[in-house]
Amino acid sequence: MSKKKDQVLLNEQIDAPEVRCVGDDGTQYGIVSRDEALKIAEQKGLDLVLIAPNANPPVCKIMDYGKFKYQQEKKLKEAKKKQTKIEVKEIKLSVKIAQNDIDYKVKHAREFLEKGKHVKFRVFLRGREMAHPEAGVEVLEKIIPLIEDIGVVEKKPHLEGRYVNMLVIPKKEEKKK
């Protein structure tokens, strides 16, 4: 992983002879030589940071680089917090499952859906059961009416390798006014 995108040129690293200089308080210094911009930054006890290297002339800002970097990291952390991670719970079944076992597994699936988690039902096909994958589809179709009130079937029962899979997601709650 390269750090090229995170690399910011500051102070003596800036090689442009002239730069458009902006102060940390928004003060416009105009187009000045790099050395003059460095002097202004040094007088204020701050850093000269290259903001727009592709502009003509390049734009530099006089600021506290440590503080700037801290605020950038803080923004990234805040953005990560706002992302929601979807958790998928998997419930395994077999073709020869009894109705009371289906009810038990559906009870757990309902609990997961109430917590906002996605549920993946998998029917494992053993040996000769692979010749009749529709038996696995039938098992999953028995489950659909038992969870319709709380979940939505996102992916209908379909064969994937030795499994017949079905994905159920929680229903969106209508906002009460």
Curated annotation (Swiss-Prot):
Subcellular location: Cytoplasm
Molecular function per GO: ribosome binding; translation initiation factor activity
Major site of localization recorded for this protein: cytoplasm
Cytoplasm listed as a keyword: yes
Keyword list, A-Z: Cytoplasm, Initiation factor, Protein biosynthesis
GO term, biological process aspect, one: ribosome disassembly
A GO CC term attached to the entry: cytosol
One Pfam family, short name: IF3_C
InterPro entries from the UniProt entry: T_IF-3_C_sf (IPR036788), T_IF-3_N_sf (IPR036787), Translation_initiation_fac3_CS (IPR019813), Translation_initiation_fac_3 (IPR001288), Translation_initiation_fac_3_C (IPR019815), Translation_initiation_fac_3_N (IPR019814)
Stated family: Belongs to the IF-3 family.
Self-association state and partner proteins as the record states: Monomer.
Function: IF-3 binds to the 30S ribosomal subunit and shifts the equilibrium between 70S ribosomes and their 50S and 30S subunits in favor of the free subunits, thus enhancing the availability of 30S subunits on which protein synthesis initiation begins.
Protein name, per record: Translation initiation factor IF-3
Naturally occurring in which organism (per UniProt): Nitratiruptor sp. (strain SB155-2)
